[in-house]
Design a protein with these regions (language model features):
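AMP-dependent adenylate-forming
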Residues: 6-8, 29-58, 75-76, 87, ...
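Flexible, low-complexity linker/hinge segments
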Residues: 15-24, 169-200, 213
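Conserved AMP-binding A3 loop
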Residues: 56-60, 192-194, 201-228
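Structural core segment of the AMP-binding/adenylate-forming
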Residues: 105-187
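Conserved AMP-binding/adenylate-forming
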Residues: 52-59, 70-117
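AMP-binding/adenylate-forming domain of the ANL superfamily
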Residues: 16-44, 64, 69-71
Length: 234
């Protein structure tokens, strides 16, 4: 194919590419795509077992799902900004991604924890990140949660931990694979101030092969750098 400018590429595939000059952070890029590439697929999955038909979740539907998560985890934007929230869940991929991004839209800082971690390992990461709120899939991880609360109760210091069950798929995707711009939707209130580039956007953690897993902070600037990678570009 003949070489062309970026505008040529846009005209060929009908996409509107978000700017990657740092003017938009990762959450804003998803919002941009919801506005300018609203009907493009974000997820594609089989409609039913044994069926060859594919269904899709568009950028618009995914963005709105994230906004519904924000309403669920922080109603009315109450409480403090930038509090750390642990996500410890076994759930569908489309729900997990919405839970992750929705927590960020809510002005909070998620730490993504593997459910394979032991209770002492989770408690160690909670304390290292000063995290007092966990969103978990209680139906499948109830035993681990019980171990975490028991571990905290044996601690010398009183450590408060709020544990909430993750929102249901039907709550976050009420029009699964069929949401349109005219579907009822209430956007989450926007923050009065945008985050700084060196603010922590979320935490990952190390494997823990040589001890307890260590929290790894990912800043908004690092998130932008991920978007510039060809293999991960949005």
């Amino acid at each position: 194919m003949a070489s062309g400018t970026k505008s040529d590429i846009r005209s060929l595939n009908g996409l509107s590419y978000p700017p990657l000059d740092g003017s938009l952070f990762f959450p804003e890029i998803i919002e941009y795509n919801a506005q300018h590439n609203s009907n493009r697929p974000y997820f594609v999955y089989p409609s039913d077992e044994g069926s060859s038909e594919l269904r899709q979740i568009t950028y618009l539907e995914f963005y709105r799902a994230c906004q519904r998560v924000a309403h669920a985890v922080r109603p009315g934007r109450q409480g403090k900004n930038r509090e750390v929230v642990a996500i410890l869940a076994n759930c569908d991929t489309i729900l997990y991604h919405a839970l992750f991004m929705g927590t960020i839209y809510a002005g909070l800082v998620p730490i993504l924890m593997s459910p394979r971690n032991s209770a002492p390992a989770v408690v160690n990461m909670l304390k290292k990140t000063n995290c007092h709120h966990m969103i978990v899939s209680l139906h499948s991880l109830g035993e681990l949660v019980s171990g975490i609360t028991a571990e905290l109760s044996q601690s010398s210091d009183l450590y408060h931990l709020q544990v909430d069950d993750l929102p249901h798929l039907a709550t976050i995707y009420p029009y699964l694979s069929s949401e349109t711009a005219t579907s009822p939707f209430v956007p989450f209130p926007k923050a009065e101030q945008s985050p700084a580039k060196n603010d922590i956007m979320f935490y990952l953690h190390s494997s823990g092969s040589t001890g307890f897993p260590k929290p790894i902070p990912i800043t908004y600037l690092t998130g932008n750098h991920y978007c510039l990678m060809r293999a991960l570009g949005l």
